[in-house]
């Protein structure tokens, strides 16, 4: 039986999400702060996700994860309990679900290193959930994508996480985030002239 990688996909879904810098007010977006205000900016390099969609023909490797940063490619079996290789990716796929008639290969890549305090894990999760949402066929708002990504980290994986990283990755640009009751928050996007964007980009070194 051909593997998904050896067949022609029915469709290809591409999704990107920015990382975050300049988190003024960071840690006021957490459960222990309860309410707070954060200013941040979404910037390149993006987390990049590509999903190649195939008809499901009963193969065992129905879902294939290609984690390029780790040099790993493996089949995911959602019916088996636990998330053992890349829990964030596997839990996000479980949360979103897979239509019964589909198989897919998902490729994830980011130039931003993990652990750099730029919200890379949130960007990866937001990009992945945004791509998976297009399978069904794409009805989540940016706010809903952010909250779904946050729920994967906190409710499914029981990790500590504020809400600003996911909101920044889902909205992009310059954001003023006001959390009025964790995890509920409003996002006001700040519009600036292109000349200011270009100057910010010229001066930014990552």
Predicted regions and their residues:
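Anion-binding (especially nucleotide phosphate/pyrophosphate-binding) glycine-rich loop
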Residues: 2-9, 13-14, 44-152
């Amino acid at each position: 039986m051909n593997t998904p990688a050896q067949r022609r996909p029915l469709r290809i879904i591409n999704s990107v999400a920015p990382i975050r810098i300049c988190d003024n007010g960071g840690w006021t977006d957490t459960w222990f702060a309860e309410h707070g205000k954060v200013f941040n900016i979404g910037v390149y390099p993006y987390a990049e996700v590509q999903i190649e969609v195939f008809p499901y023909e009963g193969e065992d490797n129905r879902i294939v994860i290609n984690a390029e940063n780790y040099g790993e490619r493996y089949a995911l079996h959602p019916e088996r309990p636990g998330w053992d290789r890349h829990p964030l990716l596997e839990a996000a796929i479980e949360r979103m679900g897979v239509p019964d008639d589909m198989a897919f290969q998902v490729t994830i890549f980011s130039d931003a290193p993990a652990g750099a305090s730029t919200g890379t894990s949130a960007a990866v999760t937001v990009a992945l959930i945004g791509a998976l949402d297009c399978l069904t066929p794409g009805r989540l708002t940016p706010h809903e994508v952010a909250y779904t990504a946050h729920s994967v980290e906190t409710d499914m994986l029981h990790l500590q996480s504020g809400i600003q990283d996911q909101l920044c990755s889902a909205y992009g640009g310059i954001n003023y985030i006001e959390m009025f009751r964790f995890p509920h928050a409003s996002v006001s996007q700040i519009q600036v002239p292109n000349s200011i964007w270009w100057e910010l980009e010229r001066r930014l070194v990552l």
